[in-house]
Amino acid sequence: MLLFVGLGNPGAKYSRNRHNIGFMAVDEISRRHRFSPWRRRFQGETSEGTLDSERVILLKPTTYMNESGRAVQEAASFFKLGVGDVTVFQDELELAPGKLRVKVGGGIAGHNGLRSISAHLGNDYRRVRLGIGHPGVKELVHGHVLSDFAKSEMPWVEALCEAVADNAELLTGKRDSTFANKVHLALQAKGFLDKGDAGAA
């Protein structure tokens, strides 16, 4: 069994925020793979299903971003999962819009959701980093992540979430590089990334 966590803030006010792209990604996994309806538990919402014969629990913490670790720890404890069974889908300022990286462990780069999860679980969980781009200067970061994607950005956001969902089965087998390559190739095919953008996980 694996736990896939999408990070974001709860409520309609935040639903299209850049900070909520993790929620958007797991919503699309649930839709594409016909997981169970979302239900409230573990200080969040869960949807359950199977990817490549592996049972997967999707979790969207409703604690707000800064306390995400409480929900993740509660779910992981209930299912007796280790930190290596947890994958977190997060927004990433340091990646260009539409780009993706997969990494196990590492720093939190100022991300409050990751800080909370690391405080509760330790650091050795997998992160699927979904690029939202950087506003250019540090002072604009807070407003950038908590503002909505522009209407003109939604095509690449939707394409990224769809590609993540279409290839999510690869994550159950730890085929992280293949997953990242396939996602980037899907975005290239739709004209959202240049040919040189694929290949790195």
Swiss-Prot record:
UniProt-annotated site: Stabilizes the basic form of H active site to accept a proton, residues: D91
Keywords for the protein's UniProt record, in alphabetical order: Cytoplasm, Hydrolase, RNA-binding, tRNA-binding
Active site, UniProt feature: H19
Gene3D superfamilies: Peptidyl-tRNA hydrolase (3.40.50.1470)
Gene Ontology MF term list: peptidyl-tRNA hydrolase activity; tRNA binding
Cross-referenced InterPro entries: Pept_tRNA_hydro, Pept_tRNA_hydro_CS, Pept_tRNA_hydro_sf
Reactions catalysed, as given in the entry: an N-acyl-L-alpha-aminoacyl-tRNA + H2O = an N-acyl-L-amino acid + a tRNA + H(+)
Superkingdom to which the source organism belongs: Bacteria
Gene Ontology biological-process entries: protein quality control for misfolded or incompletely synthesized proteins; rescue of stalled ribosome
Any one cellular-component term (Gene Ontology): cytoplasm
Location of the protein in the cell: Cytoplasm
EC number: 3.1.1.29
Site, as annotated: Discriminates between blocked and unblocked aminoacyl-tRNA: N9
The UniProt record lists the keyword Cell wall biogenesis/degradation: no
Subunit structure: Monomer.
Function: Hydrolyzes ribosome-free peptidyl-tRNAs (with 1 or more amino acids incorporated), which drop off the ribosome during protein synthesis, or as a result of ribosome stalling. Catalyzes the release of premature peptidyl moieties from peptidyl-tRNA molecules trapped in stalled 50S ribosomal subunits, and thus maintains levels of free tRNAs and 50S ribosomes.
Family from the record: Belongs to the PTH family.
Name used for this protein in its record: Peptidyl-tRNA hydrolase
Origin species: Bradyrhizobium sp. (strain ORS 278)
Gene (name only): pth
